[in-house]
A protein has these predicted regions:
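Glycine-rich anion/phosphate-binding loops
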Residues: 1-5, 30-45
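Intrinsically disordered, low-complexity segments enriched in small/flexible residues
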Residues: 1-2, 10-12, 171-202
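A structural preference for short, pocket-lining loop segments at secondary-structure junctions
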Residues: 11-22, 39-63
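Glycine-rich phosphate- or other oxyanion-binding loops that anchor nucleotides, phosphorylated ligands
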Residues: 19, 33, 39, 57, ...
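Short small-residue beta-strand/loop micro-motif enriched in glycine and branched aliphatics
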Residues: 28-31, 64
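Conserved catalytic cores of soluble enzyme domains
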Residues: 61-179
Length: 202
């Protein structure tokens, strides 16, 4: 019974208050139009007003082109909203799901302080066949997968969905300097690479 592909929620992840958003691919392919843009901007404003991190789970093929320039305008509007979040020194974590493509990738989804991605998910702007026809050469079989994108520096860490809660809360604990919520032994056992990620985001 959704009237928008984007869902915004507030809550806690292991005791850390967050504002979170996600795109439902079942709603017109997760495309972003006027309502979705407003929802994302609302989520960012809620995070700013309540001084919480913003965690987003993108999934979709891009802008809703039957809404024409209104949909495209939301690439700019959501980007400006994320910039306001960063001005307030609030963490913005993106967790890529399958697929994330088009104008979603070309705007707010690629602006995270840290980028997580689920294994094997598609992360792209234009499709593989379009690019292959343009560059006139064969592309690798893993082209535009999360593993390929990680290898080229656009994803920081590939994480199974079942492990996202732990990874997100540990990283936020470090970024927010909530020392009492962080167990050093747990960090070392759970993620050897969490410290470099925290440094990259700070």
């Amino acid at each position: 019974n959704q009237n928008s592909a984007v869902m915004i929620a507030k809550g806690r992840i292991n005791g850390i208050e967050v504002t979170a958003g996600a795109i439902n691919f079942e709603f017109i392919g997760g495309s972003v139009g006027a309502a979705e843009g407003e929802a994302i901007i609302y989520g960012v404003q809620h995070a700013i007003d309540n001084q919480t991190p913003f965690v987003f789970f993108p999934c979709g093929g891009g802008q809703r082109m039957f809404e024409s320039p209104i949909a495209l305008a939301n690439m700019t509007r959501t980007t400006l909203a994320i910039n306001e979040l960063k001005k307030n020194n609030l963490p913005y974590l993106v967790c890529f799901t399958d697929p994330t493509a088009g104008g979603i990738t070309a705007s707010f989804a690629m602006l995270g302080d840290i980028h997580f991605a689920e294994p094997g998910c598609l992360i792209a702007f234009a499709g593989k066949r379009v690019i292959q026809a343009t560059v006139k050469e064969e592309l690798s079989s893993d082209f535009q997968t999360s593993e390929f994108v990680e290898k080229h520096g656009f994803v920081d860490r590939i994480v199974e969905r079942k492990d996202l809660k732990t990874e997100i809360s540990l990283l936020l604990s470090i970024l927010l300097k909530k020392d009492n919520a962080v167990n050093e032994k747990q960090i070392n056992e759970t993620s050897d690479n969490i410290e470099p990620l925290a440094k990259a985001a700070s």
